């Protein structure tokens, strides 16, 4: 009787993890974000220029994967100041710069965990974390779980399972 209960709990947990994985894959693919908040210190055209610069750096480069990447680094890359960059990030994403940075890093980690690229396919979870800017595996796992609801190893397990299913045509 106890064995039946344990097996059922494990199956239910696996099903919950699968749902979280599927949800997170769709978020990674669509790039969903929270609703913006309003700020009046910058003109709309200034906000848009800053936002375009922020997006360019965060989406077209891997600069944010550097462990020492900060709001000051981002501001310097887009020729602005920290305060304005921080305000635009808070306004557009509805999150702090650190939260947005972690979101981008975890999204990149998910991409690297799902890629068939030989460069990343053989890396350990700690190495994937380092490749996206985390100095500590513990911090990486904590942030990964906070963003996705799964640990990197569980996520990787589902990626492998999806690959096997695609190969067998299931």
Question: Which functions belong to the PLM regions below?
Answer:
Residues 140:
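Binding-interface segments
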């Amino acid at each position: 009787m106890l064995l039946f209960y344990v097996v059922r709990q494990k199956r239910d947990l696996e099903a919950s993890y699968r749902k979280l994985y599927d949800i997170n894959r769709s978020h990674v693919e669509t790039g969903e974000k929270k609703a913006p908040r309003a700020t009046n210190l910058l003109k709309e055209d200034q906000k848009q220029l800053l936002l375009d610069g922020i997006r360019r750096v965060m989406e077209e480069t891997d600069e944010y994967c550097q462990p020492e990447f900060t709001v000051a680094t981002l501001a310097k890359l887009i020729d602005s100041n920290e305060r304005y960059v921080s305000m635009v990030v808070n306004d557009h994403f509805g999150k702090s710069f650190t939260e947005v940075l972690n979101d981008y890093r975890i999204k990149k980690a998910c991409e690297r965990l799902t890629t068939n690229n030989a460069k990343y396919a053989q890396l350990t979870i700690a190495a994937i974390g380092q490749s996206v800017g985390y100095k500590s595996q513990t911090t990486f796992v904590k942030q990964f779980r906070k963003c996705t609801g799964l640990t990197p190893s569980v996520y990787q397990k589902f990626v492998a399972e999806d690959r096997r299913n695609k190969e067998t045509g299931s």
